[in-house]
């Protein structure tokens, strides 16, 4: 699934993301995955890969085998579904530990920069 900006805003609200940080999350998602749930990134320098809407990394957060594991206790394929419940829960866990600094897409394109306008959503 590819989310439009407003679909994304509505989905994130449904998942209980903090309204005050919503523009940051939208910016992050638009820069990390272009709003796509099914995206698997090219291998990173350390050989790890990033999965799904939030581009969550398999080095620490999800297991790339069929057995759920790592810090989010999920398989990486669970991050690629159209239902973003599991991905959202894991993204919040990453955020809780590292803030938005965990995501290069946010650091490079959103930090101290104009954030997307979601006022029409």
Swiss-Prot record:
InterPro entries recorded: Glyco_hydro_22, Glyco_hydro_22_CS, Glyco_hydro_22_lys, Lysozyme-like_dom_sf
Catalytic residues of the enzyme: 32, 50
GO terms under biological process: defense response to bacterium; killing of cells of another organism
Intrachain S-S bonds: 6-121, 27-110, 62-76, 72-90
EC number: 3.2.1.17
Keyword set includes Disulfide bond: yes
Domain C-type lysozyme per the UniProt entry, residue ranges: 1-121
Keyword terms, alphabetized: Antimicrobial, Bacteriolytic enzyme, Disulfide bond, Glycosidase, Hydrolase
One term of GO molecular function: lysozyme activity
Pfam families per UniProt: Lys (PF00062)
Reaction catalysed by this enzyme: Hydrolysis of (1->4)-beta-linkages between N-acetylmuramic acid and N-acetyl-D-glucosamine residues in a peptidoglycan and between N-acetyl-D-glucosamine residues in chitodextrins
Keyword check for Disulfide bond: yes
UniProt similarity note: Belongs to the glycosyl hydrolase 22 family.
Record's function text: Lysozymes have primarily a bacteriolytic function; those in tissues and body fluids are associated with the monocyte-macrophage system and enhance the activity of immunoagents.
Name of this chain's protein: Lysozyme
Organism of origin: Galleria mellonella (Greater wax moth)
Lineage, highest ranks first: Eukaryota, Metazoa, Ecdysozoa, Arthropoda, Hexapoda
